[in-house]
Amino acid sequence: VREPKLLWNLPGNIVPPVTPFDANGKVDVAALRREVDYVVAAARPAAICVAGVEAQEYQYLDEAGRRDLIAATIDAIGGRVPALVGISHASYRESIALAEYAAKLGASAVQLLIPNRPSGGPATTAELVKYFGMISSASPLPMVAYHNPGPGAEVGLPALREILALDNIVGLKESSRNQRFLGTLIADVEDQGLAHVFTTMEVLFPTLILGCAGGTMPAPGAAISALLVEAVRAGDLARAAQMHALHAEMPARWVGANGLVPVMKASLRALGLDCGEPYPPFGAVSAAHVA
């Protein structure tokens, strides 16, 4: 048993701001700063995820643009909450370079996607452990592994345990929403002190009850998630259940027909934060779904 090294206010939520783009496809830094201010004030996050999940659309940027986005977001955070910086890349060398860059900017930790083989198909457990070992051993910051089947690999609990047993890997962001799997994962990883486990919106309430460290929440749902976490910490499970009922509907009611990023940007606009449209050619929420 080891003690995880994320010195954050847990249980709590990690919030990844969406990336606002202007009409020319450039990052709208002013809009980004307004969104970060909203996240800090309304979501009271344990950390802000910086260019670390696919819904942040960082993958459309070139390497210089990605680094500029990281720097602009950390500057907008201004030390108010910890920054968790994404370093996912097919090249382990580039991931290490991004980790070093994040450390120079004052980040708290880095996040790395569990990948498929860049050439196609699933990687073996041995390959994934080697990939994470090469990066985590060279990273100046502690690392959160990111399990997101689809954009990344789908791996089972034995492989996750091997990855999380590596030195300097202190957390797991888990996106499967499979509650049966999550129950065993929390028991074998969080409860055993191997690493902190962060789930996601639809399963936040039940997994908090099981003892997870929190969740990764999209910006427009993060204020509700903060209320849910605070209710659980206070022992007010009836209040937490009310917040959970809201999560059960949003974004599930709209995301299937429109996609996650369009729903998140439309939701932020409804909150008074215009973060633009998804990066082209992928479209916005259909007019029929905009109230």
Predicted regions and their residues:
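Catalytic alpha/beta core domains of metabolic enzymes, predominantly
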Residues: 134-137, 148-248, 252-258
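A general structural signal for well-ordered alpha-helical segments in protein cores
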Residues: 32, 70, 95, 182, ...
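Soluble or luminal CAZymes and related metallo-dependent hydrolases
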Residues: 31, 65, 127, 177, ...
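Active-site beta->alpha loop and helix N-cap motifs at the rims of alpha/beta catalytic domains
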Residues: 2-154
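C-terminal alpha-helical cap/extension of soluble enzyme domains
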Residues: 2-3, 9, 14-20, 38-45, ...
